[in-house]
Amino acid sequence: MDCKLRAKNCGGCPMLGMDYAAQLKQKEETVKKLLGRFGPVEHIRGMETPYHYRNKVISTFTTGWGGKLTSGIYAANSHKVLPVESCLLQDEVLDKTMEAVRAAAIACRYQPYNEDKGTGLLRHCLLRRGVMTGQVMVVLVTAQPVLPGAKNFVKALLTEAEKQSVTITTIVQNVNDRKTSVVLGDMEKVLYGKGFILDTLCGKTYAISPRSFYQINHTQTEVLYGLAVDAAHLTGKEVVLDAYCGIGTIGLTAADHAKQVVGVEVNREAVHDAIGNAKHNGVKNARFFAADATRWIGEAAAAGERADVIFMDPPREGSTPQFIESVARMAPKRVVYVSCNPVTLARDLELLTRKGYKVESSTPVDMFPHSEHIETVCALSKLDIYQKITVNLKMDELDVTAAETKATYEEIREYVKEHTGLNVSDLYIAQVKQKCGIKERQNYNKPKAENPKRLKCPAEKERAIREALKYFKMI
């Protein structure tokens, strides 16, 4: 399937011209090269229909042909806006919603923001859709706090959306008056609805606000989180730490299978959403804290806190050495690392394996078809330093005699000491064994002289050693 925007240097889908099966193979090979040395890499989990999966769209306003307002995306490595009416990756409902936004903005005579001159009103439009609920959010990003004729704009937008058979759930104005490439500003005003939408993921319902981190591919997110929870091997008795928890999606998915879940996230708004999501879903065994994950886990480990399972879902730059050091101090039985960057995942696995963890499996998931990005679920377990390994050996294949299998020199010394109080050396034991006809292995530490002078075992100690040999049924 081809796209007209590719010829215009869109850059959003660098692998679109490649057969999807070939894309999956290439991504799987990439993960194998990076992670194969740590443990087995499973087959990549791809999509049946790898199109129109993005439930979040950000469009930038600009001036089009004839001075008419239009919107689109930035060309690769550029600030030039490419007008977009439809996209092979975007949710088709959101394409229609964006068409309605443009029509309403034109009807209200709004002008696009000019970043060079600092003039104009409309900067961006952020759209979100709950895939399971069908709810749609429109966030209009403006360069100034006042939206002229805001009520008229809302009315026009709802009317235009209805023409497209789209029902809008909420409309929010976000104010970004800074000269920056960051999309959202700090101030928001709800123009219509409640300012958030709901969606269902892995059996839980989530409130999604304009700033919420929520995976953009609903289908593959359920695959990703399902793999993560399965990798935790939860029985209902575990204390689980969900680090970098966002709005609580992984932790709340795991809560039904754990004793307690503790989530940590640096974004306070996300933590607010996570707490609300727990209440909305009736989850009473989950707590959430607004804190830097590295600092929080460091303090928790120093205080003697423990977790049975730790979920890690860090940003693209990966985790930190300090975080991993604290993981080792908390000593969870299992660590489940959800990564969006296999390069930083490989770096962090190097540290985790040095700290006594074994990689059981790594499973790549194609969250972003036609792009080069790869998500990976990595399951790790703590090595048991007391773990016993059963090995079947044939005695006739070893350089060891039948008598030697019955007692070691140390066991003979201990027996003699316990029963007679005498201390006997290995040399004395060897002399007595030789007298008794017990065949010994070759002594690789024997003296260089042919007839070396050596002490002879005293009669009293010889009798004690013979009693030990009889006890161990060696004579």
Where are these regions (language model features)?
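Short cysteine clusters
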Residues: C3-R6, C10-C13, C340
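Short, aliphatic-rich beta-strand segments
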Residues: L127, G134-A143, T205-S209, V309
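Short Lys/Arg-enriched helix C-cap and helix-to-coil transition segments
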Residues: E440-E450
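DNA-recognition alpha helix
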Residues: T408-T420, A430-C436
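Rossmann-like S-adenosyl-L-methionine
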Residues: P148-T401, Y409-E410
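Phospho-regulated, low-complexity intrinsically disordered regions of nuclear gene-regulatory
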Residues: R454-I475
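Extended interfacial segments that mediate partner engagement and assembly in macromolecular machines
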Residues: G11-P112, L127, M132, V146-L147
